[in-house]
Amino acid sequence: MATTHLDVCAVVPAAGFGRRMQTECPKQYLSIGNQTILEHSVHALLAHPRVKHVVIAISPGDSRFAQLPLANHPQITVVDGGEERADSVLAGLKAAGDAQWVLVHDAARPCLHQDDLARLLALSETSRTGGILAAPVRDTMKRAEPGKNAIAHTVDRNGLWHALTPQFFPRELLHDCLTRALNEGATITDEASALEYCGFHPQLVEGRADNIKVTRPEDLALAEFYLTRTIHQENT
């Protein structure tokens, strides 16, 4: 797919199962309203005019995606994902064409706001390394004693942020950092951690705390509430 330097490709790793949801259906295929969580997440990306192409990495044995309208969307490419998130992202990057910048967004994070996305995308004008949406930690944080559910000490929350998605980086830089980190056995929990491993310092762009990831059963009702409220606000 041809792109310009202003166009962005989004990669959505959707090969996971999400056992903490305690359902037989992978969480990205659970429904909120008349759409799956995955559809909500992808449509939020495509709503921005700079996002011209979305690559979705699914499990090789996935039979559910083909049943969605997304399967026939002209701006969407599907690739086989890997066992780990980083493997799926790398597979997505290989299908990202010549886009200079890429977004990586959780398949199960359906409540992305357009103003947050716009501020994140603006980093391509000011940064060479990109950045992530994140929310400052507001709760008191406790460190547990090793191997015990007992408090070791309170962690200073000043300067602590919850990492969110999307995360936004130059495509080649992200590819090189992910590849190096995996080859060297580094623990990669998100895309920013791969850049950190390679000595880069991505920017933090404050995003809304209601941009939640559906991970546990109780998150589904909360995401439905946030989405319903957002749709109501947009229509009034």
Curated annotation (Swiss-Prot):
**Some GO term, biological process aspect, for this entry: which one?**
isopentenyl diphosphate biosynthetic process, methylerythritol 4-phosphate pathway
Checking Pfam families in the record gives:
IspD
Its annotated pathway reads: Isoprenoid biosynthesis; isopentenyl diphosphate biosynthesis via DXP pathway; isopentenyl diphosphate from 1-deoxy-D-xylulose 5-phosphate: step 2/6
Which catalytic reaction applies to this protein? 2-C-methyl-D-erythritol 4-phosphate + CTP + H(+) = 4-CDP-2-C-methyl-D-erythritol + diphosphate
According to its UniProt record, this protein's enzyme class is transferase
Site note Positions MEP for the nucleophilic attack applies to: 157, 213
Q: Which PROSITE patterns match?
A: ISPD
EC number(s) given by UniProt: 2.7.7.60
Gene Ontology terms for molecular function: 2-C-methyl-D-erythritol 4-phosphate cytidylyltransferase activity
What the protein does comes down to: Catalyzes the formation of 4-diphosphocytidyl-2-C-methyl-D-erythritol from CTP and 2-C-methyl-D-erythritol 4-phosphate (MEP).
Q: What is the annotated quaternary arrangement, including any partners?
A: Homodimer.
**Designated name of the protein:** 2-C-methyl-D-erythritol 4-phosphate cytidylyltransferase
Give the source species.
Answer: Escherichia coli O7:K1 (strain IAI39 / ExPEC)
User: Corresponding gene?
Assistant: ispD
